[in-house]
A protein has these predicted regions:
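Conserved AMP-binding/adenylate-forming
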Residues: 2-45, 382
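Conserved ATP-binding/catalytic segment of the ANL
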Residues: 6, 10, 17, 296-300, ...
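Conserved pre-ATP/AMP-binding loop-to-beta segment of ANL
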Residues: 20, 88, 93, 108-127, ...
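Short hydrophobic alpha-helices that are characteristic scaffold elements of the AMP-binding
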Residues: 29-34, 55-56, 172, 181-184
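ANL superfamily adenylate-forming
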Residues: 70-119
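Conserved AMP-binding A3 loop
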Residues: 123-147
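Conserved AMP-binding/adenylation subdomain of ANL enzymes
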Residues: 146-163, 171-211, 225-226
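Gly/Ser/Thr-rich phosphate-binding loop
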Residues: 184, 209-214, 223-293, 306, ...
Length: 389
């Protein structure tokens, strides 16, 4: 109601800047109900990048949590012509141009606004990291999110009412789909603002967590840095999913011994909601038993997705040959915000060109080798940075 009463209508954008917090749920679900599009902001970016994203997204409202972030946004908000209102959470308003979030929401009417939401209506607009220039706004719609939740659930569906520890940053695609998937199954998210290995281990045990998503470095920190972790009770923990990089056999072996749960790896990017490939629980067990090279893979395409490895001429290369990883599926984005040429280039022929250099083996497992932009050509041969390293 507060968003609607500020004059925002279906398709309008607003920015949310916060570390992990309960307000993320309010932001995503309340906005989605009325077709207003949240732009979750990476709190690790520099002020100039924040300013660019808020301005580029045409956000009409900015909601900011914490004294530090409010102070930083206040320093450049005069440069944001589209922003009509600034809202602060857990922070003192710098001046009367800011409004407290809970004062703002409590002052609204009790009406229950609703819009007719369609499959192709945007759920959120996340910005890429901008490794090849300015960050690009990725438009993800309702059908994309629903599809990816279902695709991932094929691997983890044995938990009917999950209790998920949300510790990865929710401005990130993987954590967002983890959040959505938990709620979709009637589960509960336990939210940590930041990653602290001791607190994570304590919460996994005391809150009887069933699953969580981390990166391998987080898993490693937990199993090697937490005192007496071997004495903690993790009997309710069913599985841990990780992403961002492969996990080493040593860390996986240690983690399986500590947590006594299954492990899975999801691979994807902002442009496909979160997950294109999945390295299953059984794959991890097989890797430790007899096929350690599997841990270098990011798995096989999830159900409903297709992956081809292509050369510079858009031709599929033989198995085992490195080329660009191209993907198609119901989770692939609609395009980039206000970037028609970049959208056409990235979605050439209806296939998402990921920018990743990879290969597929004879069994259908995908291996990411490099970024295409890091490749050089010498004497007609493609040379990847990892080969040089």
């Amino acid at each position: 109601a507060a968003l609607k009463n500020e004059g925002l209508t279906k398709g309008d954008r607003f920015t949310f800047l916060s570390k992990n917090s309960d307000e993320y749920a309010l932001m995503y679900y309340a906005a989605s109900k009325v077709g207003i599009v949240p732009v979750p902001l990476n709190y690790r970016l520099a002020d100039a990048e924040w300013e660019y994203i808020i301005d580029n997204s045409d956000s009409k409202i900015v909601i900011v949590r914490s004294e530090e972030f409010v102070s930083r946004v206040h320093g450049f908000k005069a440069n944001l012509p589209s922003v009509n209102k600034c809202i602060c959470i857990d922070a003192k308003a710098p001046d009367d141009s800011w409004t407290d979030f809970y004062d703002w929401t409590k002052s609204q009417s009790e009406e229950n606004p609703h819009e007719d939401i369609k499959d192709d209506d945007a759920v959120y607009q996340m910005y890429t990291s901008g490794t090849t220039g300015r960050p690009k706004g990725v438009i993800i719609v309702q059908s994309n999110v629903v599809a990816n939740i279902g695709q991932v659930d094929k691997y983890i569906q044995r938990i009917p009412m999950p209790k998920n520890l949300l510790v990865a940053p929710v401005y990130h695609a993987a954590a967002a789909i983890n959040h959505f998937g938990t709620i979709a199954k009637g589960g509960q998210n336990v939210i940590h603002e930041d990653f602290n290995p001791v607190e994570v281990a304590k919460t996994l045990s005391s809150e009887k967590i069933t699953n969580t998503v981390m990166v391998p470095a987080m898993i490693q920190a937990c199993v090697y840095m937490v005192p007496d972790i071997d004495k903690m009770d993790f009997t309710t923990l069913d599985h841990i999913t990780y992403g961002g990089s492969p996990i080493s056999p040593e860390v996986l072996t240690k983690a399986m011994g500590v947590f006594k749960c299954d492990f899975g790896q999801g691979f994807g990017m902002t442009e496909n909601v979160a997950v294109l490939c999945f390295l299953s629980f059984d794959d991890h067990k097989e890797a430790l038993a007899s096929k350690p090279n599997l841990l270098k893979s990011c798995g096989k395409p999830v159900e409903g997705a297709a992956i081809e490895i292509r050369d510079d001429n858009e031709k599929e290369v033989p198995r085992g040959t490195i080329g660009q990883v191209c993907a198609k599926g119901p989770q692939v984005m609609q395009g980039y915000w206000k970037l028609e040429d970049a959208t056409k280039e990235t979605l050439t022929g209806g296939w998402l060109h990921t920018g990743d250099a990879g290969r597929m083996d004879e069994d259908g497992y995908v291996y990411i080798e490099d970024r295409i932009k890091d490749m050089i050509v010498s004497a007609g041969e493609n040379i990847y940075s990892i080969e040089v390293e």
